[in-house]
Every structure is written in structure tokens, then in C-alpha cells.
Design a protein with these regions (language model features):
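Alpha-helical transmembrane anchor segments
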Residues: 3-29, 40, 172-254
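Juxtamembrane loop-helix boundary motifs flanking transmembrane segments in multi-pass membrane proteins
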Residues: 28, 32-39, 76, 128, ...
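A generic, lipid-embedded transmembrane alpha helix
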Residues: 42-59
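Transmembrane signal-anchor/signal-peptide helices with a preference for the extracytoplasmic
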Residues: 54-75, 230
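Structured inter-helical modules in multipass membrane proteins
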Residues: 70, 83-176
Length: 254
């Protein structure tokens, strides 16, 4: 589910909860909303409000951690790709085919993005990324080193290629983590309860209604940002692929 859809649904839910509170207020007898009753309602909603604030804070921290980890993984992927290319370049011209395969792998990944749905999707006769990195490793294993230096470079290239494959799948797995939906559902229920009590106690006038709608929009905006950051490779707030864009410009050079 897209982040904008999530934010929109939260806004609708909170707006409906406020409306329900206003409708209930209009139908309740006056003694149900006297000063003592309102004090009890405020005390009860204070508990729910505190829990909601804690839950929202945890979601923000979780989403920010996911986003930061994705940024680190992207830079790590770019560094390992460059390292693999340079190790193969030092080996000699025998690795030209493997270097070209590596460049095609990165170009394909950049064009398809980082979602789990596109990670290994073959098109026509083209291999998916998983097969591509295996092709690079197969070329490296088929090399016939002539001396100790080339044997060392071959072993190092195979080691780094394994790290590149591992990083690729880390990027994919982190890209599909998303939000803990059960946690988010409970949070939205708490927030809806809060906004229902706001409507229950609020006088019906344009100023109060406008403020309540703005508050609902603000909370929905926060949920939208959390949802967007929890999916770091898609959406408005996404991890830049600039490190890999920069890396691909250097691949294949002598």
C-alpha cells in the first residue's frame, strides 16, 4: 500500500472519528457532559494520548533507522562494486568480459529500482541480477592464473563478488521491510479514540472544526512520512542511488 494512501486513510479515519464525537455530543443529555464528566474524559484520554505519543515516537525511530541503514547499504554496495572492478582490472585483460557483465548488472539494477518485485525479474533473453553475478563469478573461476600475484587477485575478486551478491540481497530485503502494520493499526485506533473525544467535548463552530481538521491532517502527514521512510527505495523520501550512479561511471576504466 502506498504511503499517500496510508496517510489519506489515516486522515479519513481521524476525521470520521471527530465527526462521530460531534454527533454523539449533540445527542447526549447535558448532564453527561458536565464539568465533572469532562474531567474524567480528559484523564482517560490523557493515558491514551501518552501511549499514542510513545507509539508514534517508536515508529519514527524505527523508520529513521531503516532509512539510515539503507543509505549505508547503498554506499557499501557502490564501494564493493568499485573494488571488484579494480581488482579485476589489476588481474589483466582476461577479466574484460567479467567487468562488462558487472557493469551491465549495475545498469540493470539502477533502471529497475530496488523493490523485491523487480530484484531478479528476467526480461526477454536477459538474465536476472542473481544470474548475472553468478556469471561474473563463473568467469572469475575459469581464469588460469599465471603466477602468485594473479592467484591472489583471483581469490580476492571471488571474495568481493560474494560480498557484492550479499549486499544486493541485503538491499532488496531492507527495501521490503515496510511498517509493522499491526502496530500501526493499534496506533490509528488510539488516535481515532482521541479525536472522537475531541469532537465529544468541542463546541460546534468553524474555528474549532478547522483546528481539528488541521490536527488530523498533521497526524496523517506524520504517518505518511513514517510509511515513506520505512520503504527507503521508493516514494517521495527515498535513498539516493547517486553512489551507484557515480560508481558505474568509473566501471570498465583501465
Amino acid at each position: 500500500m502506498g504511503s499517500l494512501v496510508v496517510g489519506g486513510l489515516v486522515f479519513l479515519c481521524l476525521s470520521m472519528a471527530t465527526s462521530i464525537g460531534l454527533i454523539v455530543r449533540a445527542r447526549l443529555p447535558d448532564h453527561h457532559l458536565n464539568a465533572e464528566s469532562k474531567d474524567v474524559i480528559r484523564l482517560a484520554t490523557a493515558v491514551v494520548g501518552t501511549l499514542s505519543a510513545l507509539a508514534l515516537g517508536l515508529l519514527i525511530a524505527s523508520a529513521k533507522s531503516t532509512y539510515d541503514n539503507a543509505e549505508v547499504e547503498m554506499r557499501t554496495a557502490a564501494a564493493r562494486v568499485l573494488l571488484l572492478d579494480r581488482v579485476m582490472a589489476q588481474y589483466g585483460p582476461e577479466t574484460d568480459k567479467a567487468r562488462q557483465l558487472l557493469r551491465e548488472l549495475i545498469a540493470k539494477r539502477l533502471s529497475r529500482g530496488w523493490t523485491a518485485e523487480t530484484t531478479d525479474e528476467p526480461s526477454a533473453k536477459a538474465l536476472g541480477e542473481y544470474q548475472d553475478i553468478e556469471s561474473v563469478q563463473a568467469d572469475l573461476r575459469s581464469l588460469a592464473p599465471k603466477d602468485a600475484a594473479q592467484r591472489s587477485l583471483q581469490a580476492r575478486a571471488l571474495e568481493v563478488s560474494g560480498m557484492v551478491a550479499e549486499t544486493h540481497w541485503l538491499l532488496v530485503e531492507s527495501g521490503k521491510e515496510g511498517l509493522p502494520w499491526a502496530f500501526l493499526t493499534v496506533l490509528v485506533c488510539w488516535l481515532a479514540l482521541l479525536f472522537a473525544t475531541f469532537g465529544l467535548q468541542a463546541p460546534v463552530n468553524p474555528t474549532v472544526l478547522s483546528i481539528l481538521l488541521v490536527c488530523a491532517l498533521s497526524v496523517a502527514g506524520a504517518i505518511f512520512l513514517i510509511s515513506d521512510m520505512a520503504n527507503p527505495y521508493v516514494g517521495l523520501v527515498h535513498v539516493s542511488d547517486a553512489p551507484l550512479q557515480s560508481a558505474i561511471e568509473r566501471l570498465g576504466k583501465p
